[in-house]
């Protein structure tokens, strides 16, 4: 268990541009990141082949690539980690969909293909991602709320703290964003 304030100190160093800080942070936050990844994967399709450990490792690699990570505290760090997980899962869905259509790969036996996304599941993941991108143009804060609540699993209060707004504002954005996304995704999937 990290000493009190240790994580905050490393987050501050990371925020200030210390590239080595992430290497010190990851072991301290690994268990929490695994819980977040497990929660993310639990909401995915049956037969998903991406493991919790793989997702956490991929998050680490992508965060390292970002060079300058802007996370002043835990909620902000986990919001960034959740957004990164979402991007990884969307990329994974795109890859699976491409593989199902051949993707320039050697054909595989049908029984091995069952582990991949169904066409509908891949379409749902991609429809959610596309809808979030459209919503970001209209209501950027609402997308941040969705990312914090849905992908990070943050509470209303934690989301409010991470975004520096009131819990009531988060609640309004959360309700409106969910309704808007539901409508958009339903329309996207009807085509």
Where are these regions (language model features)?
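Short, Lys/Arg-enriched C-terminal cap helix and immediately downstream tail that follows
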Residues: 37, 178-191
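Sigma70-family region 2
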Residues: 12-16, 39-46, 58-77
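Helix-turn-helix DNA-binding module
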Residues: 152-172
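Short amphipathic alpha helix immediately N-terminal
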Residues: 136-158
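Short, charged helix-capping/linker segments at alpha-helix termini
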Residues: 16-24, 35-56, 167, 190
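Σ70-family region 2.3-2.4 aromatic/basic alpha-helix that recognizes the −10 promoter
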Residues: 30-31, 53-61, 74-95
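Arg/Lys-rich amphipathic alpha helix in sigma70-family domain 2
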Residues: 39-42, 86-105
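Amphipathic alpha-helical segment used for protein-protein interaction
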Residues: 33, 83, 115-144
């Amino acid at each position: 268990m990290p000493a009190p304030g240790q994580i905050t100190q490393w987050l501050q160093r990371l925020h200030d541009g210390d590239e080595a800080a992430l290497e010190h942070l990851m072991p301290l936050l690994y268990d929490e990141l695994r819980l977040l990844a497990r929660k993310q994967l639990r909401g995915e399709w049956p037969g998903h082949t991406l493991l919790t450990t793989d997702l956490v490792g991929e998050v680490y690699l992508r965060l390292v690539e970002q060079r300058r990570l802007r996370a002043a505290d835990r909620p902000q760090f986990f919001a960034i980690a959740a957004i990164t997980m979402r991007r990884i899962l969307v990329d994974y869905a795109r890859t699976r969909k491409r593989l199902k259509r051949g993707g320039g790969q050697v054909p595989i036996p049908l029984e091995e293909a069952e582990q991949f996304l169904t066409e509908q599941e891949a379409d749902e993941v991609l429809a959610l991602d596309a809808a979030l991108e459209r919503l970001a143009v209209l209501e950027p804060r609402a997308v941040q709320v969705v990312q914090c609540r849905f992908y990070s699993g943050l509470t209303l209060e934690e989301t409010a703290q991470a975004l520096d707004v009131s819990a009531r504002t988060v609640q309004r954005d959360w309700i409106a964003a969910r309704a808007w996304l539901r409508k958009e995704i339903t329309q996207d999937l009807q085509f």
